[in-house]
Amino acid sequence: MQHPAFYVTGTDTGIGKTMGSTALLHALRARGHRAVGMKPVASGCEHTPHGWRNEDALALQAASDPQPDYAVLNPYALPAPLAPELAAAEVGVTLALEPIVQAFAQLRTQAEVVVVEGVGGWAAPLSATLDQADLVCALQLPVVLVVGVRLGCINHARLTAAAIAADGLQCIGWIANEVDPQMERIEENIGMLRQRLAMPYWGRIPWRPGADAATQAHGLQLPR
């Protein structure tokens, strides 16, 4: 894999960033890479005997090989299912880059590739003073965009790609994730996206209820 780490963002919240990220981990592992996931900030956690745990972060941990310690994979586990800025304020936490940078450095020593999953859509802030672009710059990562294929996705994808470029960051690929089984003319919409998005197409995750990430990884077309 040309890039030893990248940041996965989406066109919106709820469009399948975690499925995209875990499928990427399985695809990388199928190529023989040691690949681990990371969820720097997760809001909406359940209290367990081991501490606060987030469902998406646990999915990334399960898809990783080797499996990192949870606290390293998810430095900020915030209980409330709110925007990170609000969820952090509820528990008196101030989100900072340094703990994330340190955790990322640990993960880089454990694997050949680190897949870092963001929050919400690209413009969703991390805090009152931090945007996701600040984190991506600090970690020196390229970006992979997951497009939730539903009505309006062409507009959302183009706006997100433009925002990433405006932040001075590189988007190295995009993934089509089918999230609306009722959507008509999916093939044509994906074709229009391929014509209009400048970055390479990394494949498609079909609508397949109940399918696990390892199965969905078969639809990805990662660069060598």
Curated annotation (Swiss-Prot):
GO terms for molecular function: ATP binding; dethiobiotin synthase activity; magnesium ion binding. Signal peptide: none annotated. It comes from the Bacteria. The keyword Ligase applies. It catalyses: (7R,8S)-7,8-diammoniononanoate + CO2 + ATP = (4R,5S)-dethiobiotin + ADP + phosphate + 3 H(+). Keywords: ATP-binding, Biotin biosynthesis, Cytoplasm, Ligase, Magnesium, Metal-binding, Nucleotide-binding. Pathway: Cofactor biosynthesis; biotin biosynthesis; biotin from 7,8-diaminononanoate: step 1/2. InterPro entries: DTB_synth_BioD (IPR004472), P-loop_NTPase (IPR027417). Mg(2+) binds at residues 18, 56, 117. One of its GO terms (cellular component) is cytosol. The keyword Transmembrane helix does not apply. Belongs to the dethiobiotin synthetase family. Homodimer. Catalyzes a mechanistically unusual reaction, the ATP-dependent insertion of CO2 between the N7 and N8 nitrogen atoms of 7,8-diaminopelargonic acid (DAPA, also called 7,8-diammoniononanoate) to form a ureido ring. This is ATP-dependent dethiobiotin synthetase BioD.
